[in-house]
Curated annotation (Swiss-Prot):
Name under which the protein is recorded: Tetratricopeptide repeat protein 4
CDD domains registered for this protein in UniProt: CTWD_Cns1
GO molecular function, one term: Hsp90 protein binding
Family per record: Belongs to the TTC4 family.
Source superkingdom: Eukaryota
Tissue: Highly expressed in proliferating tissue and tumor cell lines but not in normal cell lines.
Site for Essential for interaction with CDC6, residues: 77, 217
TPR repeat residue intervals: 79-112, 117-150, 151-184
Length: 387
């Protein structure tokens, strides 16, 4: 205690205080073996703030936070604090936390439209870098309602429209921004890019429409050719001609049905004659052959001669010769078989009243007539000879 009348600034008093201070052990200092960890807990020297602040672990930081986010402060002050916090997270490229901070600022519902517009625009920027382009677009739209001439919001909105492939909208946003600043470089570059992409998109739409119209006309011509020949299609077996045409159209627009993996399709030549993709099945060996364009006026024997001009690798007994082969088609509804004369044309068979073309790909069974397999295969089935 100071002596009465003694000057507290005198050298004697100061020396006495220092001697007393030095005689007492220092408490609260850093431990030598973990000073870096303890140093990191001091708010001023933290390299990065913790995601969750525990008052027991970081009492100083918790105290600062309570001061910064004091609920007794005005909504404007709190919103600005959250905006600044979000900006710090944004600079660190921690966009998720930036979104959270800007959202908290907006929740304060402050009366300053400019501040709210900035919060929306900044949150849009964070959402943009997170790849949430639609959310970002919603935010810049909200910002423009508060501040229609907010150039940053317009630029960000144009970027979002580009990412969402809304090229016409991107051009419109750029035009609106250029009315505010006709020399804004970002808007000029973006508008040129968006306009180019818009024209490409419009060209592609026109090409797609022309292609669709051409295919629709081709399908209609094919349907009329099929109807004129009295050929029955299992997919379009309906009374309504428009529905039948639509059924054909769907098949062509889908490429081909799953039963035809080769990409071939029914076609009509310049003379008005049809060529069909045709499948030959050899049940004895679980093998098959696919003919991509079997002209309707061609005979079965003509194709068999080509396919079996050389013995196939799977015909170990070398019995699959054109003269030995029998061709059948199956009536699935009646579980009946019809033997096809080898010299008949494809059109003659397809016009048979019990033949229904499935998946636009006629299919036929082929086996060696004199073989035990064929006899066993036909046993118990009704077999009819086409004349």
């Amino acid at each position: 205690m100071e002596q009465p009348g003694q000057d507290p600034t005198s050298d004697d008093v100061m020396d006495s205080f220092l001697e007393k201070f030095q005689s007492q052990p220092y408490r609260g200092g850093f431990h030598e073996d973990q000073w870096e960890k303890e140093f990191e807990k001091v708010p001023l020297f933290m390299s990065r703030a913790p995601s969750e602040i525990d008052p027991r672990e970081n009492p100083d930081l918790a105290c600062l936070q309570s001061i910064i986010f004091d609920e007794e402060r005005s909504p404007e002050e709190q919103a600005k604090t959250y905006k600044d916090e979000g900006n710090d997270y944004f600079k660190e490229k921690d966009y998720k936390k930036a979104v959270i901070s800007y959202t908290e600022g907006l929740k304060k519902k402050c009366a300053d439209p400019d501040l709210n517009a900035v919060l929306y625009t900044n949150r849009a920027a964070a959402q943009y870098y997170l790849g949430n382009f639609r959310s970002a677009l919603n935010d810049v739209t909200a910002a423009r309602k508060l501040k229609p001439c907010h150039l940053k919001a317009i630029i960000r909105g144009a970027l979002c429209h580009l990412e969402l492939k809304h090229f016409a909208e991107a051009v419109n946003w750029c035009d609106e921004g250029l009315q505010i600043d006709a020399k804004e470089k970002k808007l000029l570059e973006m508008r040129a890019k968006a306009d180019k992409l818009k024209r490409i998109e419009q060209r592609d739409v026109r090409k797609a429409n022309l292609k669709e119209k051409k295919e629709r006309n081709q399908n209609e011509a094919l349907l009329q050719a099929i109807k004129a020949r009295n050929i029955r299609l299992s997919e379009a077996a309906c009374e309504d001609e428009d529905s039948a045409s639509e059924g054909l159209g769907e098949l062509f627009l889908d490429g081909l049905s799953t039963e035809n993996p080769h990409g071939a399709r029914l076609s009509l030549d310049g003379q008005g004659r049809l060529s069909w993709p045709v499948l030959f099945l050899y049940p004895e060996y679980a093998q098959s052959d696919f003919i991509s364009a079997f002209h309707e006026d061609s005979r079965f024997i003509d194709h068999l001669m080509v396919m079996f001009g050389e013995t196939p690798s799977w015909d170990l007994e070398q019995k699959y010769c054109p003269d030995n082969l029998e061709v059948y088609f199956e009536d699935e509804d009646r579980a009946e078989l019809y033997r096809v004369p080898a010299k008949s044309t494809l059109l003659q068979v397809l016009q048979h009243q019990r033949y229904f073309v499935k998946a636009l790909t006629p299919a036929f069974l082929v086996c060696v007539g004199s073989s035990p397999f064929c006899k066993n295969f036909l046993r118990g089935r009704k077999v009819y000879q086409i004349r």
